[in-house]
């Protein structure tokens, strides 16, 4: 954003609005716990949907010339962040369902560490691409990397029950069978 001449005020506005979906995670969790398509798995459904939606939300930014912080940029990045927040909730829930209690602390540490390293690497890569090639190209690379990340949940299989427990029918959950 600095490379296009955005002011500190513009960048602050963009960041403050695009972070709003993260404050709404508390309301999204019960929705993710309640609705699913059994064909994809209880959590994997939300991970797949949110990853596709993340890519679709930023894809216009590959074609739109970004010359300033404006309503379109803020809207698309806020929408993108909403789906990132949904994916974050679903991935955490998948980990909680897939791990035994004695594994959760270590897994949580690895997840946080991986997220921190990923953000650092991602920021360095994005900054290099944005400055070296342009913002549109940066969003194209982002979409390509998200497409690669999409392969993990596509080819993984989710447990139909909580790890360490027998398979149970989940009460209070709407499951759509195909």
For the regions a protein language model found, what residue spans apply to each?
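C-terminal ends and interior cores of transmembrane alpha-helices
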Residues: 47-67
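Symmetry-related core transmembrane helices of the 12-TM Major Facilitator Superfamily/SLC fold
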Residues: 49-56, 137-155
